[in-house]
Design a protein with these regions (language model features):
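Rhodanese-like catalytic fold shared by cysteine-dependent sulfurtransferases
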Residues: 1-20, 26-58, 67-107
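Short, surface-exposed ligand- or partner-binding patches at beta-edge/loop junctions that are enriched
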Residues: 62
Length: 107
């Protein structure tokens, strides 16, 4: 089974419905700007935080452009967490649409 993927165009609708977004970029990248409400779990810590992704509803994983988030999704999928969805285009694509980003440590 392959990892599900959505475009940044779909993310606003998902956020409006209360979707959970996990940002796997490094802390300094997250602080510079992230999707409103996103939870920061850097890619290097994903293997130690698998349980944070086990939720009854889909978890949308984002990074800068979609590469690191896809790696995180593939790892999680292989670890049995199948409700993860990659956000293709990432934070850069989301911002390019004119969508607002938050800054600071935690959403």
């Amino acid at each position: 089974m392959s990892v599900r993927e959505i475009s940044v165009n779909e993310l606003d609708t998902i956020l409006a419905r209360g979707g959970v977004v996990i940002d796997v970029r490094e802390p300094d990248e997250f602080q510079e700007g992230h999707v409103k409400g996103a939870i920061s779990i850097p890619l290097g810590t994903v293997p130690d935080t698998v349980e944070a992704f086990r939720r009854p509803t889909p978890v949308y994983v984002i990074c800068a452009s979609g590469g690191r988030s896809m790696r995180a999704c593939e790892f999680l999928h292989s670890a049995g967490v199948t409700n993860v969805v990659n956000v293709a285009g990432g934070t850069l694509g989301f911002a390019a649409l004119g969508s607002e980003l938050e800054t600071g440590n935690e959403a």
